[in-house]
């Protein structure tokens, strides 16, 4: 069993199904430069030697340590790490987790992550942790688009931004163009529709993955 740096509390669990082979998925996730391109949680990942690295996002940096890989006879693999941040601007104090790669019958890989962390600000974490889970799930689908369809992460993020802008624009237009009670009724209806309509095929979507908060392993 993998060692963890903290006891499970409200761990985050995300799984995505990719059609790419193990070699490609491993390359896109284990290379720090490639990892930073698809994972919205990181702006930059810099190796510092002996399995250690520094990461930065929105001007807040932390450190991490790769704590080992395990390969099973069935071809599956698990990669574990620990991470920490001393910056008081970060809600995350320290944590640990792993990635698991499981080959699928007929081809492809099921890519899973499980991680937990100690929050610096428990009250804020009630909102921050679900956001982290959603961001991880969104990033996993962004990885899928890159691995399976050769859609660069930067391009898929641009498509997602444009998609969100169109949805928001439709709601705003309804508020500005209509009068009376119908204005707000239309705005509510369009907001619900904007949330429910599936994302464009080239835009990442957390809905295409399975994710949860509160997993214990």
Language model regions located:
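Charged, solvent-exposed alpha-helical segments that act as regulatory interaction surfaces
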Residues: 14, 38-41, 145-152
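Terminal, regulation- and interaction-focused segments at domain boundaries
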Residues: 2-24
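Residue-level detector of alpha-helix boundaries and kinks
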Residues: 10, 20, 86, 124-129
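Hydrophobic-ligand binding "helix-grip"
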Residues: 36, 40-47, 51, 56-108, ...
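Terminal "cap-and-tail" regions of soluble proteins that handle hydrophobic small molecules
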Residues: 2-5, 104-217
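Amphipathic alpha-helical segments
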Residues: 18-39
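Intrinsic-disorder/low-complexity, polar/charged segments enriched in Ser/Thr/Lys/Arg/Asp/Glu/Gln
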Residues: 9-17, 94-96, 108-112
């Amino acid at each position: 069993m993998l060692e963890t740096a903290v006891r499970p509390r409200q761990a985050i669990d995300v799984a995505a199904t990719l059609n790419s082979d193990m070699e490609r998925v491993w390359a896109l996730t284990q290379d720090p430069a490639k990892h930073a391109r698809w994972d919205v949680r990181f702006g930059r990942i810099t190796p510092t030697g002996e399995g250690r690295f520094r990461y930065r996002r929105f001007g807040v940096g932390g450190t991490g340590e790769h704590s080992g890989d395990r390969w099973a006879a069935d071809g599956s693999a698990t990669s574990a790490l620990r991470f920490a941040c001393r910056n008081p601007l970060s809600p995350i104090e320290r944590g640990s987790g792993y990635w698991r790669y499981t080959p699928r019958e007929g081809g492809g890989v099921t890519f899973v992550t499980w991680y937990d962390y100690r929050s610096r600000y428990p009250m804020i974490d009630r909102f921050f942790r679900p956001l982290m889970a959603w961001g991880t799930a969104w990033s996993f689908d962004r990885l899928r688009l890159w691995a399976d369809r050769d859609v660069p992460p930067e391009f898929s993020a641009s498509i997602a931004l444009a998609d969100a802008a169109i949805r928001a624009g439709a709601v705003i237009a309804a508020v500005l163009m209509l009068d009376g009670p119908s204005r707000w009724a239309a705005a509510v209806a369009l907001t619900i529709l904007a949330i429910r309509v599936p994302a464009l095929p080239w835009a990442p979507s957390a809905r295409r993955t399975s994710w949860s908060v509160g997993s214990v392993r």
